[in-house]
């Protein structure tokens, strides 16, 4: 798998032959206010490439990134953000319970 790149406003990965295969999704597994699910002002924050790269690179500047890109964000993101790589074109669901989020990709489609 090649290094992630930003394409069409999302952080993505390509396989060795150059085919686009995965997209990065950001979520907050801690309880409180779900990062990608609670604030309706920033519905696309789940795909933010700059924040996803910050998380993948150790998270040392996440506070600055979130404050700059999402001022006034209503979410409990400081308890920890995670990136999950999802296969391109695969349906997913961002599940949330009491602010704790997780990505579900294995579910029946009727």
Feature map (PLM): residue ranges:
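Catalytic phosphate/metal-binding cores of nucleic-acid and nucleotide-processing enzymes, i.e., regions
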Residues: 2-110
